[in-house]
């Protein structure tokens, strides 16, 4: 027959030791994350989706994708004609005039403002190029060359210098008579380098045609004097009496 002591019968709780308390605390601290990771996969998926959504939408970018797209406005012929006439009057339109044009042409004021900005830039490019629009066919073909603009400016400057020089030609005294208009109509000049006749003219100083003629006349007169025989009959020594004469 099994015997029981008084403590087991009364049911006095046993006080846990220090080792048991530390082991229990460690088990309670490590078990919840492990159980949550293996038994709650939807929470991890939801957290990843939220992080991806936060990275896709910038907090300072409130614009939609449709607002970021810009479409080119197709102007009608009447609208372009009206805008061109207004641009001929004044390059910079006031807000009042812009509002009147917007109401007349059924266009937004922002579109009219952008059109005038682009038109001013186009006019500035034409003024810098120094050419009237539209270009002649030869000049248009010449301007297709990447280096054509620089070469055309150099040729035009050299031709203007030669036209005011003593030779009255396009390039001075070299005998060439190319005018600025003819120089601009040469669409296939070499893109690199500088014309050889221009470099030759830059090293030579322009000389006056009168000086050349005078030097030539001096040379010819000296040659004639050397080749002409000396006539002693008309010299003053022959007409004077000789000191040894007996008369």
Swiss-Prot record:
Biological process per Gene Ontology, one example term: cell fate specification
Compartments (UniProt record):
Nucleus
**Gene Ontology CC terms, in alphabetical order:** nucleus
Q: Which domain of life is it from?
A: Eukaryota
User: Which residues form the DNA-binding region?
Assistant: 68-127
Does the keyword Zinc belong to this entry? Answer: no
Matching entries from InterPro entries are given as: Even-skipped_HD, HD, Homeobox_CS, Homeodomain-like_sf
Q: Which Gene3D superfamilies match?
A: Homeodomain-like (1.10.10.60)
Outline the segment boundaries, as ranges, of region: Disordered: 194-247
Q: Where is the composition biased (Low complexity)?
A: 194-209, 233-247
> Keywords for this entry?
Developmental protein, DNA-binding, Homeobox, Nucleus, Transcription, Transcription regulation
Q: Which Pfam families match?
A: Homeodomain
Q: Which GO terms describe its molecular function?
A: DNA-binding transcription factor activity, RNA polymerase II-specific; RNA polymerase II cis-regulatory region sequence-specific DNA binding
Consequence of substituting residue 119 to C = In ED7; partial loss of function
Family in the record: Belongs to the even-skipped homeobox family.
Please name the PANTHER family in this protein's record: SEGMENTATION PROTEIN EVEN-SKIPPED
What does the UniProt function comment say about this protein?
Answer: Transcription factor. Involved in motor neuron fate determination and maintenance, acting as a transcriptional repressor to counteract gene activation by transcription factor unc-3 in a subset of motor neurons. Probably acts by binding to specific promoter elements. Required for posterior-specific pattern formation in the embryo and may have a role in regulating egl-5 expression.
What's this protein's name? Homeobox protein vab-7
Q: Which organism does this sequence originate in?
A: Caenorhabditis elegans
